[in-house]
């Protein structure tokens, strides 16, 4: 079973950000370093030290620890170096050192665990060693790669705290904030941690209302969002844009596909770990699960694709919508409820009804191009305007969606899907992972 534990948004968000950056500026950086002037004559395009770190520091770089010390110009401290003056002691960064440090961050972008070869020397360096080397050349003062790594982490944590504080106060501004809910934001509610789910055991296939029944011969049972009587065929959240007679369609989230017997069975997550991420009132996730059927509950972790450079907005006539499709072996009137939640509280709810169409001896339900509400459009646009991916993920820690499909006449829950989100990496497209919710 999956075990969700709290983890540092700083470490996951920043390391993900680091791995997406490239070393394309290294050759230019080398030339810039060779043209460096001596101490005291450095022109500064950076903000002063007391103004705080710049907006994009990158993440703590671990590549320094992987480099052979024989190739270092600036390595670990020797005994003589430990006798440096207090102004140069570890943790003390004078303005000239800080300025050179910030310049080096810009010159040498994060490169993961790769090493960099300087063509004039033929030596291999990690990023932290290059930063330490740059500081030495510019200021004449020594900083080791370990001190550089520690300083990067300190500044990154400080920056993340500042961002999270601003998000609480500034992100949820009028225009996003619903007028119908007074408990939309509660400072006593802890943010929703979004750690990656560690590997857990797989579930057994379910073919009845309770577990323990032998597996069905249908390939989707136990491998997709489905029960023996009802299943999700497709779910797509998208925007459509038309510019100069050119039509664009961008997918934020997409679920679907045809499962086969070769697909692995779904892994499980204890539903109690996410109860506080969704409304607790009557009709909330906990209440629904207790009423059952318990084989109808699923968790979907979505990596939403926000990587589009197209300028959008409701005022330009762009369309934001959702298309979903379901299949049943019973003819019922389907009621689909979609609840958007923030900090575990309901923000808005949309309820739609759909009648079936008989196709290939199955009853099919299609909810086509259902428009997103103004709240969701504003939320996506504000999220896209955040400058860094880890900032977006920090916001999404507190954002969830609960979707409940019921039969109108009996009010039986046919499917209940809990969605949590992160932002997809650059150029990776949208992906997702499905878990079956259980209670042990």
Swiss-Prot record:
Keywords linked to the UniProt accession: Activator, Cell cycle, Developmental protein, Differentiation, DNA-binding, Metal-binding, Nucleus, Transcription, Transcription regulation, Zinc, Zinc-finger
Any one Gene Ontology molecular-function term assigned to this protein's record: protein domain specific binding
The answer to whether UniProt assigns keyword Transferase to this entry is no
Give the residues annotated as coiled coil: none
User: What InterPro entries does UniProt report for this protein, alphabetically?
Assistant: TEA/ATTS_dom, TEA/ATTS_sf, TEC1_TEAD_TF, TEF_metazoa, YBD
Describe the subunit structure: The C-terminus of sd interacts with the C-terminal serine-rich protein domain of vg, to form a complex which acts as a selector for wing development. Interacts (via C-terminus) with yki (via N-terminus) and this interaction enhances its transcriptional activity.
Protein name (record): Protein scalloped
- Recorded source organism is Drosophila melanogaster
Q: Which gene encodes it?
A: sd
